[in-house]
Amino acid sequence: MSQPYLISKWMDPLFGIFVGTYGYYLYEKEHRPRGRSLRELALRKWNKQAVSQQSMKN
């Protein structure tokens, strides 16, 4: 018995990726407090690692 698809065999995964990405975008834009977005958290982590690597070199 073949599996049922919402749209088609190839469009279902693309639709899932689109919905997930859009949901993530909305969460980042609306529900995260200022200063806590993924971009800001990643930059903070990156800067922290860069400082620790420079202190190890000196």
Curated annotation (Swiss-Prot):
<keyword id="KW-0472">Membrane</keyword>
<protein>
    <recommendedName>
        <fullName>Non-classical export protein 1</fullName>
    </recommendedName>
</protein>
<keyword id="KW-1133">Transmembrane helix</keyword>
<keyword id="KW-0812">Transmembrane</keyword>
<dbReference type="GO" id="GO:0006887">
    <property type="term" value="P:exocytosis"/>
</dbReference>
<dbReference type="Pfam" id="PF11654">
    <property type="entry name" value="NCE101"/>
</dbReference>
<comment type="function">
    <text>Involved in a novel pathway of export of proteins that lack a cleavable signal sequence. May be part of the export machinery or may also be a substrate for non-classical export.</text>
</comment>
<dbReference type="InterPro" id="IPR024242">
    <property type="entry name" value="NCE101"/>
</dbReference>
<comment type="similarity">
    <text>Belongs to the NCE101 family.</text>
</comment>
<feature type="transmembrane region" description="Helical">
    <location>
        <begin position="10"/>
        <end position="27"/>
    </location>
</feature>
<dbReference type="GO" id="GO:0009306">
    <property type="term" value="P:protein secretion"/>
</dbReference>
<keyword id="KW-0653">Protein transport</keyword>
<keyword id="KW-0813">Transport</keyword>
<dbReference type="GO" id="GO:0016020">
    <property type="term" value="C:membrane"/>
</dbReference>
